[in-house]
Amino acid sequence: MTVDVTYQPQRVDGLTRMGLVTLTNKSDHTCKVEGRAAISLVNAADEVVDVPIEEADEPGAAIPITLKPGRSAFEGIKWTLCDKSDADCGVGNSLRFNLEASTDGPYARLDGFPAPEKSAITMKSMTIGTLQPSTQGVVAW
């Protein structure tokens, strides 16, 4: 599996930001996914940053999805920006994903995010939606 997280500039609302998570089956075999892909903020020292996570049934309840090779499933993430100098602000330069645990998976490819050397991804909290078979409504909550 690979994951791409695409920043959604049209979904900016105050300090709230959104990303479209695209989970793609890169194997030669059909697989099933259900629920959500855990997303973690990671810093330049390759450490998972502690960010409060909330799970939301958005845009609806999770359903089993069968992914043939090359096919994708989608989920939305929403996070609240914070000031790097705040003690409760998570600061990182990349994101990881995991389908089996809540942290420490492979790196996601980021599109539209700050350059990694800037360590400019800030998160006070993050909400993760459910995996869906299409992009419809995935970042509309």
Feature annotation, model-predicted:
Residues 28-30, 82-85:
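Short beta-strands and strand-coil junctions in structured, solvent-facing domains, enriched
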Residues 52-82:
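Intrinsically disordered, low-complexity Pro/Gly/Ser/Thr-rich segments with frequent PxxP/GP/PP motifs
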Residues 72-74, 81, 87-141:
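Extracellularly exposed regions in secreted/surface proteins, prominently low-complexity, repeat-rich
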Residues 33-48:
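Short acidic, flexible loop segments centered on an aromatic residue
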Residues 3-7, 39-41, 89, 97:
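Extracellular/mature segments of secreted proteins
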Residues 1-13, 137:
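Low-complexity, acidic Ser/Thr/Pro/Gly-rich terminal tails and inter-domain linkers that flank the onset
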